[in-house]
Amino acid sequence: SKDSVYQAIKKLENTYVIYTLKHDEKKLQKIYFKDFGLRNNLCISKDFSHLFENLVLSELFKFKEEFFYNKYFNFYSQISKIAYISSPTLDIDLIKLRAKKILPKALELGIFHVIFITLSSEDSFFEQGVKFEVISFDKFSLGF
């Protein structure tokens, strides 16, 4: 039943196996594994972009902030006003196009720093006062 699923999810969250991330407007939640390797072993589908997103969130735990998500940002903090987008394979030109599309939402939420985390690309640019930073995961995980 639905209730038993919710109880099981809550139990896994309380035992630090999973982490639930709330949507900023709707009553939706995404589930991430604290140990992303466990997630990879349990899932039949080995989608690298989802695994990379889980890896990025694992690194964000060190900030000890509450993060939210929406259709524009994988993670953002309402306190620090920083948004993070997991983009392992997008090139700089596609990231700049995506930045223009998400700019109105960033301004609406008061976010003035958007960080794209990639496998290896790096760049930095401004649009209407919002800093868009493209950094490699290794630099991100070391505290850029």
Region annotations inferred by a language model:
Residues Y84, I115-I117, E133-I135:
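Hydrophobic/aromatic beta-strand patches that form the interior of the parallel beta-sheet core
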Residues S1-K81:
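Accessory nucleic acid-recognition modules appended to NTPase machines
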Residues A106-G110:
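Short, conserved loop/helix-junction motifs that constitute active-site signature segments
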Residues S121-F144:
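Domain-level recognition of nuclease-like catalytic cores that cleave nucleotide substrates
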Residues V56, L60, F73-I102, V114:
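Conserved catalytic cores of phosphodiester-cleaving nucleases, focusing on short active-site segments
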Residues L38, F67, T89-D91, S121:
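Short, glycine/serine-rich, charged loops/turns that create anion-binding
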Residues Y72-F73, I117-S124:
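Short, polar loop motifs at secondary-structure junctions
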Residues C43, L94-I95, F125-E127:
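Short glycine-/acidic-enriched loop or helix-start segments at secondary-structure transitions
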